[in-house]
Amino acid sequence: MLCLPXFIILLLLASPAAPNPLQTRXQSNLIRAGPEDANIKTXKRVIISGLXXSILVPLIDAIIG
């Protein structure tokens, strides 16, 4: 009988320390992955637009001139 109050106190202390549910972890991973993916896509766009500008500008100048 003396163990029951101690067991209840341990349960109350352990409940806030419980890990997040799987869905919440998956959502936080998606949120963290979003900006990284956006930076990679932006870097690819910058590289592609730089290559396109370096190729298209001389081509257009050659056609016009």
UniProtKB/Swiss-Prot annotation:
Lineage of source species: Eukaryota, Metazoa, Spiralia, Lophotrochozoa, Mollusca
Modified residue annotations for Isoleucine amide: 64
Misc. comment: The mature peptide does not contain cysteine residue.
Domain of life where this protein originates: Eukaryota
Molecular function via GO: toxin activity
Provenance organism: Conus ventricosus
An example Gene Ontology CC term for this record: extracellular region
Stated name of the protein: Conotoxin VnMLCL-031
Propeptide: 20-43
Range of residues in the leader sequence: 1-19
Subcellular location: Secreted
Keywords linked to the UniProt accession: Amidation, Cleavage on pair of basic residues, Neurotoxin, Secreted, Signal, Toxin
Chief site of localization: secreted
Family: Belongs to the conotoxin T superfamily.
Tissues expressing the protein: Expressed by the venom duct.
